[in-house]
Design a protein with these regions (language model features):
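Patatin-like phospholipase
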Residues: 1-49, 57-360
């Protein structure tokens, strides 16, 4: 099947922090290596959420997954020279506001105790301190400046409407409580760097990002991995990359036997992943039934793969392990004639290169 005759293939890359982006790069690099007529930078539409938004922009801007893979493996490569300080920068404005509000709440507490020592509404006073918490601990300002420099140096379009192939980045309007598609009207002229950080602004950790007078927070998988956006752009097939899934552990697990032994954050992470994965799978199933003309192909880590789970989403130092693990597992899947991923991609007109052989 020649390239012009191939069905339109869209890509939806979901978030998952730095480690999630590394997983997605590893998967896409393996697809480029193993498949005929597949280059991740030449697909028909790109949808990105969270750190997936950064990857979507890079691919749509002409960077191949193989190039990104090599660059991220090599710390000396200057393609995407991200450092910790680009992300780990305190949101001083919010912290100053929180400090002032905490002082005010403390004064009101002591005032209430002095005036009515026996009638103090403790929970009401505690609420004042909750209201004093910052909207986010870190700022995306440094990351935005870094992304803007990368976009400029690599010749990537500076606004979302300037791409040759459609790019849609997902965020949530904080005050409206709704999903927003950056790249569609009235946000088609949005700065690429600003749109990326709006999609990446994970609540609590990062302060909301202001865009056109509105506050935005990062998007996650949503109810259906945002495949509806790719379908509206005319894609007959949509690849969905979801790096974050619940882990399955037990006595035979090499790193973890019981999650409760690893503490509160591990338990919370597993709980969040269970809920998110359930919503995603149910949403994809509903969409598939309502739109049988659109074929959906979900790519995720194996449930027993502890590589993605045991590293913090912000752990840039784990990039080599995650990149190579995702690349290796995807390659093995594609070399297996019985694997559903291979069958799905062949249905989309992308054949495994014969020279790569089979692992059947």
């Amino acid at each position: 099947m020649s390239a012009p005759d191939l069905p339109k293939l869209g890509l939806s890359i979901l978030g998952g922090g730095v480690t999630g982006a590394m997983y997605s790069v590893g998967v896409l690099a393996a697809l480029e290596e193993q498949l005929e007529d597949f280059r991740a930078s030449e697909l028909d539409a790109y949808v990105g959420a969270g750190t997936g938004a950064v990857l979507a922009v890079g691919l749509a801007g002409g960077l191949t997954a193989q190039r990104l893979y090599r660059a991220l493996l090599n710390p000396a490569d200057d393609l995407f020279p991200m450092k910790r300080h680009h992300l780990l920068r305190l949101e001083r404005r919010e912290l100053r506001r929180a400090f002032g509000a905490t002082v005010a709440a403390t004064k009101k507490l002591f005032g209430s105790v002095r005036k009515h020592p026996l009638d103090v509404d403790l929970w009401h006073e505690v609420d004042r301190f909750f209201d004093a918490l910052p909207a986010g601990v870190l700022t995306m300002d440094g990351f935005e400046q870094f992304l803007a420099s990368v976009v400029d140096r690599r010749g990537i379009p500076a606004t979302l409407d300037a791409f040759e192939r459609p790019v849609r980045l997902m965020a949530n309007d904080l005050d409206a409580g709704t999903r927003v598609v950056l790249g569609e009207a009235p946000h088609e002229h949005t700065s690429v760097a600003r749109a990326m950080v709006a999609s990446c602004a994970a609540p609590v950790l990062f302060a909301p990002v202001e865009l056109d007078g509105r506050d935005y927070i990062g998007s996650n998988a949503g109810e259906m991995g945002h495949v509806d956006v790719a379908a509206q752009l005319g894609c007959a097939h949509v690849l969905v990359l979801n790096p974050q899934v619940p882990i399955r552990v037990g006595p035979d697990s090499s790193r973890v036997q019981r999650l409760r032994q690893r503490g509160l954050l591990w338990v919370y992470s597993q709980s969040w992943r269970i809920v998110t994965e359930s919503r995603l799978l149910q949403g994809l199933e509903r969409f598939a039934k309502a739109h049988p003309e659109v074929a959906l192909h979900l790519i995720e880590p194996e449930r027993d793969d502890t590589t993605m789970f045991t590293h913090s989403p912000m752990n840039f130092a784990a990039r080599r392990e995650i990149l190579e693990d995702a690349y290796r597992r995807t390659t093995l899947a594609l070399r297996n004639p019985q694997h559903p991923l291979r069958a799905a991609l062949e249905a989309a007109g992308r054949q495994v290169r014969e020279s790569q052989g089979d692992a059947g």
